[in-house]
């Protein structure tokens, strides 16, 4: 969910997506109705190991896909200090931390 298309259908569409996923019992990461929801990992037990899945999205601040705040919906922000602190926090609690990141400049080739 942490990607630049989260708000393609506007604020109502983003909220509706979260509502439907929750109603259907589909776990999701990287976006939510506030930063607490957007930053909450999905936890799975795999071969007796607890694994935390986190998702972050880098973006240039254009305003079209805002980062979540304490009171506003959005995506889980991807900036160095924050990502490192989140990984460290969850490494203390779980056997593994898997980070899914969405970043890069749109419409550019790989170099």
Regions from the language model: what does each represent?
Residues 2-111:
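Acidic, metal/ion-coordinating pockets
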